[in-house]
Structure formats: C-alpha cells, structure tokens
From Swiss-Prot:
Species, as recorded: Escherichia coli O111:H-
Keyword Oxidoreductase: no
Protein name: Uncharacterized 37.6 kDa protein in cld 5'region
Top-rank taxon: Bacteria
Coiled-coil residue windows: none
GO molecular function (one): lyase activity
PANTHER family: EPIMERASE-RELATED
InterPro entries (UniProt xref): Epimerase_deHydtase (IPR001509), NAD(P)-bd_dom_sf (IPR036291)
Binding site for substrate: 126
Catalytic-site annotation from UniProt: 151
Assigned protein family: Belongs to the NAD(P)-dependent epimerase/dehydratase family. dTDP-glucose dehydratase subfamily.
Length: 334
C-alpha cells in the first residue's frame, strides 16, 4: 500500500510513518520544516525514516500548485494527515499561520484526495473540539459547537470539511480526536518536554491553574497503534443514519470520527510527580492562573474505538514518562 503522510517530520507523523514502513508499506512523507521549534529535531526524525520505501518532499500544505502536482504524480492509495500547528496558546498569537496550515492546507489535501480516488483519508482532529463541554468523559456523541481557541475551531472546521467531501464525492474519511499525546521524540513546546528541559537545567517550571487541571495523557505508541489499526477500517455510508437519531460521529456519507485517548485523566501535579520520580529531581514550580484557551479537564470515551479495532490506549503515565525521560537523556546526552 502507498501512503502519503503529511507532517512526517513531526511528532505523530514520524511515529506513524515508522510503523507503516515496518509493516512493509511505501510512505511518501511531506513537511515544510518550519522553525516553530528546533528544525534539527525534525531532521533527526527524518534521518531515522530514511530507508527503502520512504521518500520525503519539503512542501507546504498551503502550496496549492505543489500539492496538486504531488497528488497527480504520487499515485497514493491512502492519506494520513498528522497534526499541524498544534499549540492552543500559539494559535492565539499567530492566527493566520493556523488558517494557512489547518484550513487552506487541509482543503488542498481534500482536493487532492477527491481528484485522485484515495481509498481512505485519516486526519488528525483534537480533543480541543470539545471546548466548553463539561460532561465527562467526552463522547463523540456530544456536541462540539463551542470551541475556546482558534486551534480548536480549525479542528472542528476540518471535521466539517471532511464530512462535506465525504458527502459530495464519496471520500471515505476518518477523523481522529487525539487526547494530549506525549512520549519519545515529542515536541519541545509540549509540557513534558519543557518541564524535563527546565528541571535538568535547574530552572523553574510554569504550572497553570495552580496544578488544578486534569488531562487524558495518551502515550505515542498507543496513538500509533490505534492509527495503524484504523487505516484498515474504511468507513462506509450508513443508509439508516439520520441527523435526528444518529450520532454526530457518523453519517449517511462514508465518514467517521473517533476519540483516541487513555480514558484515565491524570492530575497535572501527578504528571509532574511522575516526571520528578523519573528524573530524580524535585521541580521548582511557578504556580500560575489558567491561561486563555485552556480547559480544566479532558477525558476520552473510547467505547466506539474499541468496538471497531478491539484496542484502547493503556500505557500508564508512570511508564510513558519514564520512556520519554530515557529518550531525552539519550538524545541530548544529559
């Protein structure tokens, strides 16, 4: 099978590409290698992917002509869109960058899929779409009409755009709502990475809402495993579905949405404790108020995911954080 993986030099795109290659698939990876964070980390990921069956193209998703040419010559069978422009707080400071990548770039991929008969499009959505929802755990049956950040709004828009193309053109599309992904080769702007770096350098860490937050931390290997299983679960039109009686996660079109999370929310302070234990260092903490765009808790209802792939993420925070610390020390020689 031949795959196009966008954001292949990024955290999730790298891990998914690696798993696909290990399974014997061909992978064409693309990334614009922007300097939002350390490009050398992205290059290091690509070096590990440089093996038979992998090709890389530096291209921006918002490059309409470039993306059209890539699809026309690529002869892809399936497409995985990994997360682009992820940080909630950064989206408040750089809204146009998010529109270019998450909206214009997403549209270019949908057009490429439409005109080139892609078998299955899997794309990254986010738990952030649940926004002001308070009912726990978050279910794909819930409304997601009240986002609290521009990033979340673009992810909601992606789901709507994907549904439109599924409905109009019969494009099988699966949306993946990821819940706080962490682990080896993670992004430097993520809490675990920032905390680890600061603690090893003897610096303080910023703890928002005074630590009174919960996240459904989900280990990267579990995320990749779920994606690998879901790529073979190609959605079909549900002729019995109606707006009045059906779940928002399905449709009369070949369209589905799933939560991918650990289904076990962890207090931020417990997450930090796991890191302190793994590093053998007590963190110096700056206790700060809740930041704009943040929510107090996330929790994934993954029953629908389990029903179709027989798998739900299960790596504990203790084990996952320890694995990250081992990778960080090895990669940065600290």
């Amino acid at each position: 099978m031949k795959y196009l993986v966008t954001g292949a030099a990024g955290f999730i795109g790298f891990h998914v590409s690696k798993r696909l290659l290990e399974a014997g698939h061909q992978v064409v990876g693309i990334d614009n290698l922007n300097d939002y964070y350390d490009v050398s980390l992205k290059q290091a990921r690509l070096e590990l992917l440089a093996q038979p069956g992998f090709q890389f193209h530096k291209i921006d998703l918002a490059d309409r002509e470039g993306m059209t040419d890539l699809f026309a010559s690529g002869h892809f069978e399936r497409v995985f869109i990994s997360p682009h422009r992820l940080a909630v707080r950064y989206s408040l400071e750089n809204p146009h960058a998010y529109a270019d990548s998450n909206l214009t770039g997403f549209l270019n991929i949908l057009e490429g899929c439409r005109h080139n008969k892609i078998q299955h499009l899997l794309y990254a959505s986010s738990s952030s779409v649940y926004g002001l929802n308070r009912k726990m755990p978050f279910s794909t049956d819930d409304s997601v009409d009240h986002p609290v950040s521009l990033y979340a709004a673009t992810k909601k828009a992606n789901e709507l755009m994907a549904h439109t193309y599924s409905h109009l053109y019969g494009l099988p599309a699966t949306g993946l709502r990821f819940f706080t992904v962490y682990g080896p080769w993670g992004r430097p702007d993520m809490a675990l990475f920032k905390f680890t770096k600061a603690m090893l350098e003897g610096k303080s860490i910023d703890v928002y809402n005074y630590g009174k937050m919960k996240r459904d931390f989900t280990y990267i290997d579990d995320i990749a495993e779920a994606i690998i299983r879901l790529q073979d679960v190609i959605p079909h039109a549900d002729t019995q579905w109606t707006v009045e009686t059906g779940t928002p996660a399905a449709s009369i079109a070949p369209y589905r949405v799933y939560n991918i999370g650990n289904s076990s929310p962890v207090e931020l302070m417990d997450y930090i404790q796991a890191l302190e234990d793994a590093l053998g260092i007590e963190a110096k903490k700056n206790m700060l108020p809740l930041q704009p765009g943040d929510v107090l808790e996330t929790s994934a209802d993954t029953k629908a995911l389990y029903e179709v792939i027989g798998f739900t993420p299960e790596t504990t925070v203790k084990d996952g954080v320890k694995n990250f610390v081992n990778w960080y020390r090895d990669f940065y020689k600290v």
